Amino acid sequence: MDPNSIEIELSDDDRVISFHANRQNLINISEYFKILLTKFNLHDKQQIPIKVPNAFVAYDIIVELTENTESNVGNLPVWEHYLEKLKFMDYVGLSAKMIRSIDTTNIVVPKSNFESLIKLYEQLGYNSSLIPLIKNSFQKDNTNILIEPHVAKKLLNVSESKIIHAGYTRGGLHVINYCDYIDRKIIHTFDKHNDFISFLSYSKWNHDASMEQYINSIAISPNKKYIALATTCGLIIYNLIDKTHHDTIQTNQNINFVDFNYSSTNIFYRKRKWIGANGSNKVGIYNLETSKEISIGIDNLRNYHSKLSSTGTDLCILSKNLLVMCDNFNRIVVINYALDKIIKILDSCIYLKNNDNTNTVFLFPSSNKKYLGHLIVNYKKIYVQKSDTYTLFVYYIDSKRQDLQYVIEYTGSAPVHIDISNKLVVIGDCTGFFSIYKYKSGKIVFRNKIKSHNSCVTSIAISSNNKMILTAGLDGLLKLWNSKTLNLIDSYYHGCEYVDFISFTSEFGLDFDNFLRKSISNKSIQ
């Protein structure tokens, strides 16, 4: 018998495979076999037992490396055979380049095995053969799988126009790309001292050209193509795809409200007169296709009030050509602006026991433009105090239905920003706390309140799958929370006063919710 011939016994949890191989050929394969066959008192044995993850695949690889012959003794599907081979190569410390590469461009991994594919990628690091395999196998309903940043960057070659976070400061507007957001990099800044300086120098502005220009609010079109800035000098529109200036609307008034319609064709904005003057009932409409602007007058559009929050609005645009406003009687008026017709008037105050000393704080539309929060304060003095009580009425509003869903009684520090989804309501207040309410079938089934920032929560938002909450504060921190456990997932310093949590879909159907960094808290969202 050949002294170099040994019997290898490969075993896993289900099977045992025995075969003869040349000892020296095995030693030449890798350091793993060299150590195995020259140490541990195995150098003089003729039968070597080896425990492996998959005996069939281990046999195939040994045959391929020692005899230069392809083998698939277990008759596994191509995708499974290839992945198992990669696992074994990693198990014994071999380079994946040693095995025959296969064309994975047309191979699809079943949905039930997709998560194991992602875990293998994260385990092995970058592998060019796995990239097309992941792209081909991803399905839009794989929403519970969290993909690490390095995977996301290799998977998606998406331009900077794909936005996850937009924010503004007194110094300018910041736009963060979703992939670079994960690495905490601001990839483009529209700075007032650069991009904005041309607008400040226009002689047509009806104010001192040296006057500081502030951004009051921002809105991003549903198709993610445009961003509109409501400023103290007028309305500025950027094309986010080309990163170019689209247009500037010059006004004689401060603009505090801006929003897009559902089809991303029109921009609505509210003009405001200077302090001490009554609010204007004029609403401007700018058409992005024609670059033309008109103003419409709305009867009983409420005058601006000193108690209005700085982050809400008393005018908003919902889906299906609906404009919703708060009138001088604190009622919600639902208008089909395409038909120039009032379709519903909702009076929240009729539900209050004492509405003599109440006032609307603001309206807060949901990101899907189907829900509307109407926040009313019952105050004891002319100025809002910590002892004031608030009532939030949440309505479902479309062209056919205008229904009150539920009511939230809120007592405590003044609310600053509210976001609403189909399952959650979150309220950020002026002392750095945020409250979360979960509802089902019109009833609040869970509520909690936690400290999120050292000072005012300037903005708060809910992710599209209701699994995450994003908060921003005057402390300059942007924080991401697990809405189920209320654990902090991640945080970083951004310096923005306002954040907008935007969900988008790339050409591969991957949503941002799949790209959370898990390294900070090591907590995944179930």
Curated annotation (Swiss-Prot):
Pfam families registered for this protein in UniProt: WD40
Keywords of the record: Repeat, WD repeat
Each WD repeat, start to end: 210-248, 452-491
Classification via SUPFAM superfamilies: WD40 repeat-like (SSF50978)
Protein name: Uncharacterized WD repeat-containing protein L344
Record field: transmembrane: none
